[in-house]
Amino acid sequence: MDRELGLRERKKLQTRQLIADTARRLFIERGFDAVPVAAIAREADVSEATVFNYFPSKEDLVYQGLEAFETELLAAVRDRPAGESIIAAFGRFVLEPRGFLAAGDEAAARLLTQASKMIASSPALLAREQQIYARYTASLAALIADDTNAEVGDLRPRAAANALMGVHRTLIDFVRCQLTGQAVDRVRIAAEVKARGQQALDLLVAGLGTYGAKSATGSL
């Protein structure tokens, strides 16, 4: 019985991956908005209902890998060692190279470049991305509130979560911009993500009180 369940679960994972891979290929070839779910189902040799059983929306076919990111991010903050701050745990996780930036796979770099261009050209995908990160921010805020025993109505957990996720979103935008260039230098991009991300986090640690204050001459 256990063996049958194992085979069944593997079959489900294989089907899910097949659908995701098929969708990604078609989206890159034709553009996200030009590919209906029916075409994905036909290419993957499954029904439309099966596609939606695995992916609630067409947009989720693009962002399906982000579920694991959310789980791992929250775990990194929640399970941080004693004495480590929330911002330090967040930075340690977010600034760690992953995917293409860690492996340097040329095929992965091409896929990431193509996906970045596809997302940038699709209002539907950009809107879905905003929804996903809003959910992440809410989850992080809830974790921070619980971790700090914040009272109901305390805005600091939400403000902190928005600030931290703002750094992450800014780094994503930075990487996407770098991928639009002629030559993609993985080592340089990874180093800049770490350095620029740490700069942004350091700013949050120091506080915004004097950031951008003008001097007597009017300069910053």
Short names for language-model regions:
Residues 6, 30-32, 45, 52-64, ...:
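HTH DNA-binding helix-turn interface
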Residues 173, 177-220:
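C-terminal peripheral helix-coil segments that are non-catalytic and often amphipathic
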Residues 64, 71-115:
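Hydrophobic alpha-helical connector segments
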Residues 134-160, 181, 212:
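Hydrophobic alpha-helical bundle segments that form small-molecule/ligand-binding pockets
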Residues 1-30, 34-46:
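Basic, helix-initiating cap at the start of DNA-binding domains
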Residues 110-138, 150-151, 190:
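Short secondary-structure transition hinges
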Residues 19-27, 73, 90, 129:
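Short hydrophobic clusters on alpha-helical segments that form packing/core surfaces
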